[in-house]
Amino acid sequence: MRELLRAGFRRMGKSIVFWLSMAASALWSGAIVAIRYSELETRPQYGDLDYILWEFTPMMGIFAAVFVCLFIGVEHSDGTMRNKLAVGHSRWAVYFSNFTVCAAANLAVMFTWVAVTFCLGVPLLGAPKISAPEILLNLALAALTVVSSTAIFLLVAMLTTNKAASAVACILLSLALVIAGSYFYQSLQEPEMTSPGMMVNSDGSMEWIDPQPNPRYLEGPIRKVYEVMAMVLPTGQQIIINDQYLAQRWSDFFSFTLVTIQPWTMALCSVLVTVLAVWTGAAIFRRKDLK
């Protein structure tokens, strides 16, 4: 296992995809800080480092999908996977070593974003207003979603020997997860009552409209189901973390139901998804015929 990990990390260090992902993460975070700084006078609500710090979270699934499918795809196409098995390594060891390397790579991309955002954001926008323990908690939750996303995409990549097919499948899956996570989150944000407003009558007079029950507001068992899905999906958690602080800033202007961060529930869901995806993928890979 240690030999597999050493070989995997050496290959990761030489991987163009890995370094391009790191560079893209650094440039993207730097660009966002620069844009927010340039808009401080006209759009100050977007210049808060508390919000900018988490903008990476909804995109980490796509970063993870691209790296995993290409990194593992090369192992399939070059015959590296078969060679590992031919020299006596077990399929379980091969699978878990690849998971460890891919998870470490994706976490490195994530923390590159965080480091660049802090290094540029603090001098330009000021220090975050939230406490250090809260930042560390959110970073830990975000890291767990990155690991669970890696486990999901690794399952697809390890079981798809064709590199092109693996890339298409992983990227489409990442987009589907983003759409699903956004759908469940947005559905939970619907307010229980509609906002009050004014109506113009036919005679030109104005009439005040009282708040009405919102037909799209979820309640009862269906709301519990949506909450569970938003927590189970890595993208659902990532959107919750990302929107938490911007939503608080806009709460005086818009009416919505804020989906709050539930640390223990979110962490447990990420761990369960990771364990289930890795165990399922390893069990199937153990019986797969590698061509």
Predicted regions located by residue number:
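Alpha-helical transmembrane segments of multi-pass membrane transporters/translocases
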Residues: R2, W208, N214, T235-K291
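Aromatic- and glycine-rich beta-strand/loop motifs that create alpha-glucan
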Residues: M1-S25
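A helix-boundary/kink motif common to multi-pass secondary transporters
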Residues: V17, S77, S90, T161-N162
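Secretory targeting signals
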Residues: F18, M22-F71, F96-C170, V178, ...
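Transmembrane alpha-helical segments in integral membrane proteins
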Residues: F63-H76, L154-M158, N162-K163, S270-K288
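Transmembrane helix boundary and interhelical loop/hinge segments in multi-pass membrane proteins
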Residues: V68-V87, R91
